[in-house]
């Protein structure tokens, strides 16, 4: 089995771009099979005092099945835990991590956001007992984070478990917050389910209050309590200052003499008209103008009705009837005017012809 030929199936090379993506462990289960070599931070099993078998159920170590045999340190780390029962270990890890991922995340976030927890040392919660068998290292090396030059593992996880004695713990590391949004608090969780398994199980979940994560619930009320505890002292100081200012104002009001001159000046000037009286006067003016407009309109309709011959005797004719009859009467008058104009032109032509006839007869 060639390790390089199948590496792109198990590991994402562009981890920086995918860092703030909210991906649940259960949704991306192939991340649990990514073949990432862990740094050799612990001494070999045979060198430390009290070193024995790595685990009671694992036989002699076999070489790493991939093709990464060039580096001695990596081959040493690969050959330690990859025994005959690696398939059962992977199956048990996948089964239990799928169920307990949400509980781990919630417990880690609640411990991280607790108001009483120190910020320098992140809290560590023990992993589920069914996930990994217990292991006692012979001579564990002192805890030290991985250097910044580590490829792939540092970019994805943020930090790793420094020694094999801490393989059963979950390291919660706070990632640098983005400057654009102060509310967003990404949390990266790195889990090594099996201390003898060189395959590092990575999954990172960015928890943001503005971006909904369907795999995780809202953070507990400890976040709101922390904000309240931060705002509490400031609010108390502001309330004390406000109370002190009120007491000073009351003292000044008691000590200061009554303003006699201002009261006398106010008594001399008439009081301004209130807004109620202004509204009443405006309403009266509006009603008067509206009544006048209606009376004028009614009188005009009555005059138009009197001009129409067919409606002169109808005292209660509606306005629509008055307008329609007036239109018909107007059209009739216009037609009669045109007819009379044509008759007038004809009569004038006839007159001119008669005058010429008379002039012709008188010439003889």
From Swiss-Prot:
<dbReference type="InterPro" id="IPR011598">
    <property type="entry name" value="bHLH_dom"/>
</dbReference>
<comment type="subunit">
    <text>Efficient DNA binding requires dimerization with another bHLH protein. Binds DNA as a heterodimer with MAX.</text>
</comment>
<feature type="region of interest" description="Disordered">
    <location>
        <begin position="41"/>
        <end position="81"/>
    </location>
</feature>
<keyword id="KW-0539">Nucleus</keyword>
<dbReference type="GO" id="GO:0005654">
    <property type="term" value="C:nucleoplasm"/>
</dbReference>
<feature type="region of interest" description="Disordered">
    <location>
        <begin position="219"/>
        <end position="285"/>
    </location>
</feature>
<dbReference type="GO" id="GO:0003677">
    <property type="term" value="F:DNA binding"/>
</dbReference>
<dbReference type="GO" id="GO:0046983">
    <property type="term" value="F:protein dimerization activity"/>
</dbReference>
<keyword id="KW-0238">DNA-binding</keyword>
<dbReference type="InterPro" id="IPR036638">
    <property type="entry name" value="HLH_DNA-bd_sf"/>
</dbReference>
<dbReference type="Pfam" id="PF01056">
    <property type="entry name" value="Myc_N"/>
</dbReference>
<dbReference type="GO" id="GO:0000978">
    <property type="term" value="F:RNA polymerase II cis-regulatory region sequence-specific DNA binding"/>
</dbReference>
<dbReference type="GO" id="GO:0000981">
    <property type="term" value="F:DNA-binding transcription factor activity, RNA polymerase II-specific"/>
</dbReference>
<feature type="region of interest" description="Disordered">
    <location>
        <begin position="111"/>
        <end position="172"/>
    </location>
</feature>
<dbReference type="GO" id="GO:0006357">
    <property type="term" value="P:regulation of transcription by RNA polymerase II"/>
</dbReference>
<dbReference type="GO" id="GO:0045607">
    <property type="term" value="P:regulation of inner ear auditory receptor cell differentiation"/>
</dbReference>
<dbReference type="InterPro" id="IPR002418">
    <property type="entry name" value="Tscrpt_reg_Myc"/>
</dbReference>
<dbReference type="GO" id="GO:0005694">
    <property type="term" value="C:chromosome"/>
</dbReference>
<protein>
    <recommendedName>
        <fullName>Protein L-Myc</fullName>
    </recommendedName>
</protein>
<dbReference type="GO" id="GO:0000785">
    <property type="term" value="C:chromatin"/>
</dbReference>
<dbReference type="Pfam" id="PF00010">
    <property type="entry name" value="HLH"/>
</dbReference>
<feature type="region of interest" description="Leucine-zipper">
    <location>
        <begin position="333"/>
        <end position="361"/>
    </location>
</feature>
<feature type="domain" description="bHLH">
    <location>
        <begin position="281"/>
        <end position="333"/>
    </location>
</feature>
<feature type="compositionally biased region" description="Basic and acidic residues">
    <location>
        <begin position="228"/>
        <end position="245"/>
    </location>
</feature>
<dbReference type="InterPro" id="IPR012682">
    <property type="entry name" value="Tscrpt_reg_Myc_N"/>
</dbReference>
<dbReference type="InterPro" id="IPR050433">
    <property type="entry name" value="Myc_transcription_factors"/>
</dbReference>
């Amino acid at each position: 089995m060639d390790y390089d030929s199948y590496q792109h199936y198990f590991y994402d090379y562009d981890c920086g771009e995918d860092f703030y993506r909210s991906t649940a462990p259960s949704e991306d289960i192939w991340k649990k099979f990514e073949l990432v070599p862990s740094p050799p931070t612990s001494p070999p099993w045979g060198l430390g005092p009290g070193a024995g078998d790595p685990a009671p159920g694992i036989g002699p170590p076999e070489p790493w099945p991939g093709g990464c045999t060039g580096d001695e340190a990596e081959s040493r780390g690969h050959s330690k835990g990859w025994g005959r029962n690696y398939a059962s270990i992977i199956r048990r890890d996948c089964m239990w991590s799928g169920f307990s991922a949400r509980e781990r995340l919630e417990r880690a976030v609640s411990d991280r956001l607790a108001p009483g927890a120190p910020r320098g040392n992140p809290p560590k919660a023990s992993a589920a007992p069914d996930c990994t068998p217990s292991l006692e290292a012979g001579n564990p090396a002192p805890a030290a984070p991985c250097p910044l030059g580590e490829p792939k593992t540092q970019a994805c996880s943020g930090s790793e478990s420094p020694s094999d004695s801490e393989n059963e713990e979950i390291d919660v590391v706070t990632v640098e917050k983005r400057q654009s949004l102060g509310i967003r608090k990404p949390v990266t969780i790195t889990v090594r389910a099996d201390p003898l398994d060189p395959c590092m199980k990575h999954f990172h979940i960015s928890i943001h209050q503005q971006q909904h994560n369907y795999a995780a619930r809202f953070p507990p009320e400890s976040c709101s309590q922390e904000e309240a505890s931060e705002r509490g002292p400031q609010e108390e100081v502001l309330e004390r200052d406000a109370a002190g200012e009120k007491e000073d104002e009351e003292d000044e009001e008691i000590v200061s003499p009554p303003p006699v001159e201002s009261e006398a000046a106010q008594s001399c000037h008439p009081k301004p008209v209130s807004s109620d009286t202004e509204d009443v006067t405006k309403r009266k003016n509006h009603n008067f103008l509206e009544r006048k407009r209606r009376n004028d309109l009614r009188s005009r309709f009555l005059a138009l009705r009197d001009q129409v011959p067919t409606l002169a005797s109808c005292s209660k004719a509606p306005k629509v009837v008055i307008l329609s009859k007036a239109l018909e009467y107007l059209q009739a008058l216009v037609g009669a005017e045109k007819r009379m104009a044509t008759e007038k032109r004809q009569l004038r032509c006839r007159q001119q012809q008669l005058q010429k006839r008379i002039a012709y007869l008188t010439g003889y």
